[in-house]
């Protein structure tokens, strides 16, 4: 029997850019000002485009941001909050379908991620909401450490937990490394991850999947 589900947030429960691009303006300007020739204009444009769909730290590492660019980005991104209510994907009502503990583990800037969860109105669905905060590097244990901590604290067996998310480079990878099954949500623009245990188009498929696993 599956004992708990661990969900991702962005591109799993809500589009990462549902808040729009405007709140990101000051952070992107700060990164551009701190560039000072580190990246060519084309390379910088490519990096900025990646920011819309990937975690900032991953983008900074991939594109070779300078220390000044990283510091500018962290400083300004850390100030962003969701400007208003969010709706998420149209299947969030299925979060009511589960009678097992649900956990939410999301990577990003703490203020922004916590404001997204509040704006979606989904806090009460989860036993715990944990932010893998990019802007708190000294305390950061990343998603792998957070998920392992959930298993250890609650005494869950690894074969009775499922991680639900979209990113093959983040939660899907972590699940594989920890020996946990994963369900990849194939939201618009998400490519199937070969290493995900299962794939679904929307959360409405999860209850039947869990029922089939309980019958095994």
Regions found by a protein language model. Give the residues of each.
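Asp-based, Mg2+/Mn2+-dependent phosphohydrolase catalytic module
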Residues: 1-3, 96, 103, 109, ...
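Active-site neighborhood of HAD-like aspartate-dependent phosphohydrolases
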Residues: 1-41
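Short catalytic-loop micro-motif centered on adjacent basic/acidic residues
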Residues: 14, 43, 104-105, 163
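A metal-dependent, Asp-based hydrolase signature
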Residues: 30-33, 44-80
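Short helix-capping segments at alpha-helix termini
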Residues: 30-38, 65, 121-125, 155-156
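Alpha-helix C-terminal capping segments
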Residues: 43-48, 60, 92-100, 192-193
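Short, acidic loop-to-helix structural element flanking the phosphoryl-transfer center
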Residues: 78-104, 144
């Amino acid at each position: 029997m599956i004992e708990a589900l661990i969900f991702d947030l962005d591109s799993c429960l809500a589009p990462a850019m549902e808040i729009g691009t405007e709140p990101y303006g000051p952070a992107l300007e700060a990164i551009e000002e701190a560039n000072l020739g580190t990246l060519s204009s084309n390379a910088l444009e490519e990096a900025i485009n990646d920011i819309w769909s990937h975690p900032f730290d991953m983008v900074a590492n991939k594109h070779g941001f300078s220390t000044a660019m990283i510091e500018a980005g962290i400083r300004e991104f850390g100030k962003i909050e969701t400007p208003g209510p969010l709706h998420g994907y149209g299947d969030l009502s299925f979060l009511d379908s589960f009678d097992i503990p649900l956990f939410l583990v999301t990577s990003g800037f703490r203020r922004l991620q916590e404001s997204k969860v509040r704006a979606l109105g989904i806090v009460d669905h989860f036993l715990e909401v944990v932010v893998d905060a990019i802007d708190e590097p000294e305390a950061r244990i990343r998603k792998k450490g957070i998920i392992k901590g959930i298993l250890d604290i609650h005494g869950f067996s690894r074969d009775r937990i499922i991680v639900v998310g979209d990113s093959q480079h983040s939660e899907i990878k972590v699940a594989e490394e920890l020996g946990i099954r994963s369900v990849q949500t194939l939201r618009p623009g998400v490519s199937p991850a070969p290493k995900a245990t299962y794939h679904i188009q929307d959360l409405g498929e999860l209850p039947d999947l869990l029922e089939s696993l309980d019958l095994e």
